[in-house]
Amino acid sequence: MAGTVHCSIVSAEQEVFSGDVASVVATGTLGELGIHPGHTALLSGIKAGPVRLVMEDGSEEIFFASGGFIEVQPTAITIL
């Protein structure tokens, strides 16, 4: 799909979300992160707070992270 990137949110117990998204917004240790398709590779800690997934149709899903890490690759985003 053009304009999307695969995103996985994984907790210690299970995979919470897996699918294509238009963007991801989360709070990194140094501030707000906005990730879109084609973003440069990144590994960052994330602070406790909402993780907002924007779908291709503009709808949003919001998850709560109690902290963790975000890994961004050209074709995938993983939040642990």
Q: Where do the PLM segments sit?
A:
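Short, charged, intrinsically disordered terminal tails
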Residues: 1-4
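Compact, glycine-rich, soluble single-domain proteins
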Residues: 6-80
